[in-house]
Amino acid sequence: MAGLWRSYQALMAKHPWKVQIITAGSLVGVGDVISQQLIERRGLANHNARRTAKMMSIGFFFVGPVVGGWYKVLDKLVTGGTKSAALKKMLVDQVGFAPCFLGAFLGITGTLNGLTVEENVAKLQRDYTDALISNYYLWPPVQIANFYFIPLHHRLAVVQIVAVVWNSYLSWKANKM
């Protein structure tokens, strides 16, 4: 396991952006597999591989670039590594970024699932508030620790590891019709 971590760190040092995006996409896919197998109890025979591929695409092309880029912007908006700075970063993240990101994520997923604009709006009206409240139960303490203890280039990976559980929930919520 230590060798795997060293390899990951070496790749992060050499190709940080690519590794962050690949990590995000892969872990969004893992979250969907967990959602289908453990939450929805589909079984392997009924696993929707196309849905997992769609969720991975959202991870590769939306989650990874947007969240990875956001952490760079946030580090410039709120500087320093103090507890106070970590708290400020968490507040800006959870008040400014999380609501927008979550709405976009649910909307993109609905679009990729073939929902019309009207169906997508109705789904957002039905699911957004519940998903945002769930977000606030999980992410504030995770983000304070992330912003205080974790270097910028590892933040997306740390968040995505925690997010395997969150991605499972989001995949279930986003794909529930």
Curated annotation (Swiss-Prot):
Keyword rRNA-binding: no
Lineage, uppermost ranks: Eukaryota, Metazoa, Chordata, Craniata, Vertebrata
Pfam families tied to this protein: Mpv17_PMP22
Alphabetized UniProt keyword annotations: Membrane, Mitochondrion, Mitochondrion inner membrane, Transmembrane, Transmembrane helix
Protein name per the record: Mitochondrial inner membrane protein Mpv17
UniProt record similarity statement: Belongs to the peroxisomal membrane protein PXMP2/4 family.
GO terms, biological process: developmental pigmentation; iridophore differentiation; liver development; regulation of mitochondrial DNA metabolic process; regulation of mitochondrion organization; regulation of skeletal muscle fiber development; regulation of triglyceride metabolic process; UDP biosynthetic process
InterPro entries for the chain: Mpv17_PMP22
Domain of life: Eukaryota
Gene it is expressed from: mpv17
Tissue distribution of the protein: Widely expressed.
Site for Determines ion selectivity, residues: 93
Topological type in the membrane: Multi-pass membrane protein
Compartments, record wording: Mitochondrion inner membrane
CC per GO annotation: cytoplasm; mitochondrial inner membrane; mitochondrion
GO molecular function, one term: channel activity
Role of this protein: Involved in mitochondrial homeostasis, and control of oxidative phosphorylation and mitochondrial DNA (mtDNA) maintenance. Non-selective channel that modulates the membrane potential under normal conditions and oxidative stress.
